[in-house]
């Protein structure tokens, strides 16, 4: 995916050195955007192998409103282990905000249900938005949302999605985020009777950790391979009815995985 390689090269060429919360240090740029046409293949990196199973399970976990890692652990997904407490809880993170945003009068807002209904009934709305950035609950979260806010857009029978990501771990996190939101866009499009359009990824602080620079250069040296296709069970009509078995990745032939440490 040239868009992603261009981002990494831009950071290596133009980035500034910054300190960060984890103490690792980064090379960073501010404000960057990528666009992926979902009709041209599923945007899963081919220049290193990614674990699509983890991405899919995490997205299904978000959509169920879950904030305990038990479901992930039961499915051999460990990407949230470093942040969970001794009981597996993460506080009111993504799934809670997506499905149960608390209101001052003690009620809760299911943003996912609301946005799907709005897409179906008022597709030209400019309010097709879901936010995970709840200022009043940031301190309760084990990790504040990195991918904080997304908006849908309907035109010509296609559903597009733009994500704003405040903090972007470009080597490890961003490839997961691209695939996750591309899949979410396809799922929402299906249940709304639309085709998938574009996924637009807007980054705030886009950074390579200082211990990922050599891995990034190795990845940049690799040739692109054809993008895979993601097949979704067409019988699923509700965004909350999807199961892991409803997704089939076809034609994925990536270069080998590149190991890199997670900054916690």
Swiss-Prot record:
Binding-site residues, (6R)-5,10-methylene-5,6,7,8-tetrahydrofolate: 51, 169, 263
Primary localization: cytoplasm
Residue positions binding dUMP: 21, 126-127, 166-169, 177, 207-209
A GO MF term: thymidylate synthase activity
Pfam families referenced in this protein's UniProt entry, alphabetically: Thymidylat_synt
Domain of life of the source: Bacteria
Compartments, record wording: Cytoplasm
UniProt GO cellular component terms: cytosol
Classification via PROSITE patterns: THYMIDYLATE_SYNTHASE
Catalytic activity: dUMP + (6R)-5,10-methylene-5,6,7,8-tetrahydrofolate = 7,8-dihydrofolate + dTMP
GO BP, sorted A to Z: dTMP biosynthetic process; dTTP biosynthetic process; methylation
Pathway listed: Pyrimidine metabolism; dTTP biosynthesis
Entry keywords, A to Z: Cytoplasm, Methyltransferase, Nucleotide biosynthesis, Transferase
Enzyme Commission numbers on file: 2.1.1.45
Family: Belongs to the thymidylate synthase family. Bacterial-type ThyA subfamily.
Record-linked PANTHER family: THYMIDYLATE SYNTHASE, THYMIDYLATE SYNTHASE 1
Assembly information from the UniProt record: Homodimer.
Name of this protein: Thymidylate synthase
Organism: Cytophaga hutchinsonii (strain ATCC 33406 / DSM 1761 / CIP 103989 / NBRC 15051 / NCIMB 9469 / D465)
């Amino acid at each position: 995916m040239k868009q992603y390689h261009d981002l990494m090269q831009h950071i290596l060429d133009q980035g500034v050195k910054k300190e960060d919360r984890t103490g690792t240090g980064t090379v960073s740029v501010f404000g960057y955007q990528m666009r992926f046409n979902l009709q041209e293949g599923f945007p899963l990196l081919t220049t290193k192998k990614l674990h699509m199973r983890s991405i899919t399970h995490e997205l299904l976990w978000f959509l169920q409103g879950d904030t305990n890692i038990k479901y992930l652990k039961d499915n051999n997904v460990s990407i949230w282990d470093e942040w969970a407490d001794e009981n597996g809880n993460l506080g009111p993170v993504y799934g809670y905000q997506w499905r149960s945003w608390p209101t001052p009068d003690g009620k809760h807002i299911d943003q996912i249900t609301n946005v799907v209904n709005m897409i179906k009934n008022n597709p030209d709305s400019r309010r097709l938005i879901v936010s995970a950035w709840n200022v009043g609950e940031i301190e309760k979260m084990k990790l504040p949302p990195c991918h904080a806010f997304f908006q849908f857009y309907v035109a010509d029978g296609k559903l597009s999605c733009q994500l704003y990501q405040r903090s972007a771990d470009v080597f490890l996190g961003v490839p997961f985020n691209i695939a996750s939101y591309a899949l979410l866009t396809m799922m929402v499009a299906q249940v709304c009777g639309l085709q998938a359009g574009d996924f637009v990824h807007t980054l705030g602080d886009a950074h390579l950790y200082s211990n990922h620079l050599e891995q990034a250069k190795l990845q940049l040296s690799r040739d692109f391979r054809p993008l895979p296709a993601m097949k979704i069970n067409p019988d699923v009509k509700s965004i909350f009815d999807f199961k892991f078995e409803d997704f089939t990745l076809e034609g994925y032939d990536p270069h080998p995985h590149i190991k890199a440490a997670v900054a916690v």
